[in-house]
C-alpha cells in the first residue's frame, strides 16, 4: 500500500497526497461504448476458461432473459442477483454501455451461476450460501473479464491503463480498506472489554492511527479524516467486513489458477 500511495502521488503530480486524493481518478477512464450484445460476448469469452458446461448455462441465462438490463423510470439503481430455490436466478442491473457496466454483468452473472449450480446440486436446506463465499464466485468472473481484456493484443493504451487502475482500486478498497475496518472493529471491542471508555475522542484516535499505519508516511492525514468511522454502516453488523478481503483474495487466487 505504501508503494501504491507513492505511485499515486507521482502520477497525480502533487506535492502532498491527502486522504481525499486517494479517491481521485488516475486515468481519464475508458471512452469506449459497448452494446449489450457486445457485453454478452465479452462475458462469454471471459468465462470460457471455466468450461463448456459453465458457458452453456451463461448462454442459457442470456437467451432466456434472466437479466433486467437497462435503466427505466421508477427502477432501482445498482445491481443484484436474486431468485428462489425453484426458479431461475434473476439479475437486476442498469446497463449503460460502459466498461463498468460490462464488469457488473460479469459480476452478477457469477452470483447467478453460483445460485444455479447450488440449487441444482443441493437440497433446498443446503442450497443457500454464506457471505463468506458469496463474493468469490462473482469476483472470479470480474477478474477473468479484466484478465481477458488485458490479454487482447490490440487493446488501446488508455483502456489498458484503466483496467490496471481498476485492479489496483479493487485491492485498495476491498482488501486493504476492509481489513482496516476489521482491525478498527476488533480494537474497539477490545477497548470495551478492558473497560475503557468508547467516547468519540478514543474512537477518533484509533481510526486515525489505523489510517496512518495502513497508508504510510507519504499520505497527509487531515484531522477531519478521524471522523470517517462514524459514517461507515458496516459496523452495525459486527465482525463481517473481513469477509470482503478474504473473498477478494480467494477470487484473485482462483482466477489466476484457472488461467494457468
Where is each model-derived feature located?
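Cation-handling catalytic/transport regions enriched in His/Asp/Glu
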Residues: 1-260
Amino acid at each position: 500500500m505504501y508503494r501504491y500511495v507513492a505511485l499515486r502521488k507521482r502520477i497525480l503530480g502533487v506535492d502532498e497526497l491527502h486522504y481525499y486524493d486517494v479517491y481521485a481518478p488516475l486515468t481519464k477512464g475508458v471512452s469506449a461504448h459497448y452494446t449489450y450484445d457486445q457485453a454478452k460476448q465479452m462475458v462469454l469469452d471471459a468465462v470460457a476458461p471455466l468450461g463448456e458446461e459453465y458457458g452453456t448455462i451463461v448462454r442459457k441465462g442470456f437467451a432466456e432473459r434472466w437479466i433486467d438490463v437497462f435503466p427505466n423510470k421508477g427502477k432501482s439503481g445498482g445491481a443484484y442477483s436474486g431468485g428462489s430455490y425453484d426458479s431461475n436466478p434473476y439479475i437486476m442491473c442498469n446497463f449503460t454501455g460502459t466498461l463498468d457496466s460490462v464488469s457488473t454483468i460479469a459480476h452478477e452473472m457469477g452470483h447467478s451461476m453460483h445460485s444455479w449450480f447450488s440449487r441444482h446440486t443441493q437440497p433446498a436446506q443446503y442450497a443457500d450460501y454464506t457471505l463468506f463465499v458469496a463474493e468469490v464466485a462473482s469476483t472470479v468472473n470480474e477478474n477473468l473479464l479484466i484478465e481477458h481484456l488485458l490479454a487482447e493484443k490490440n487493446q488501446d493504451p488508455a483502456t489498458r491503463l484503466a483496467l490496471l487502475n481498476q485492479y489496483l482500486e479493487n485491492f485498495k478498497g476491498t482488501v486493504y480498506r476492509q481489513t482496516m475496518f476489521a482491525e478498527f472493529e476488533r480494537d474497539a471491542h477490545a477497548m470495551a472489554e478492558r473497560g475503557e471508555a468508547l467516547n468519540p475522542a478514543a474512537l477518533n484516535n484509533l481510526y486515525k492511527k489505523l489510517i496512518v499505519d495502513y497508508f504510510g508516511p507519504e499520505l497527509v492525514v487531515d484531522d477531519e479524516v478521524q471522523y470517517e468511522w462514524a459514517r461507515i454502516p458496516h459496523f452495525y453488523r459486527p465482525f463481517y467486513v473481513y469477509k470482503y478481503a478474504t473473498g477478494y483474495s480467494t477470487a484473485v487466487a482462483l482466477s489466476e489458477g484457472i488461467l494457468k
